[in-house]
């Protein structure tokens, strides 16, 4: 089934200048970039986007990291886009990520792990709406 999902290329990947390589992974695996923008998240936006993690011990570090530099936010579209994106990203901890996944190849740590991807179709809809107006899609 054709789906849309949200992907964020995080500050660590932008600092390493691997944005193009990451986008190529998506495109060469059947995911089309249908919307994209580069921005610098405010603390408030980062806190709102990651509100589900507010009570978790890593929340403060996550927010500090996500506002430490610019990010690239994209809507990816393709067959089973949510699952395909998650497979391409690899495990949250790059040390556990399968060889050839984005996190295994470009991430440094569980915190600086290069990319974010929606974990369900419902969350994909909500996350896309957080960053993109319907007219932009």
Swiss-Prot record:
Q: Where in the cell is it found?
A: Cytoplasm
Give the residue range of the signal peptide.
none
Q: Which cofactor does it need?
A: Mg(2+)
One annotated Gene Ontology cellular component of this protein: cytoplasm
In this record, what's one Pfam family? NDK
Q: State the reactions this protein catalyses.
A: a 2'-deoxyribonucleoside 5'-diphosphate + ATP = a 2'-deoxyribonucleoside 5'-triphosphate + ADP; a ribonucleoside 5'-diphosphate + ATP = a ribonucleoside 5'-triphosphate + ADP
Q: Which residues form the active site?
A: 116 (pros-phosphohistidine intermediate)
Source taxon at top rank: Bacteria
Q: Which HAMAP family match?
A: NDP_kinase (MF_00451)
Q: What is this protein called?
A: Nucleoside diphosphate kinase
Its source organism is Helicobacter pylori (strain P12)
Species classification:
Bacteria, Pseudomonadati, Campylobacterota, Epsilonproteobacteria, Campylobacterales
Q: Which gene encodes it?
A: ndk
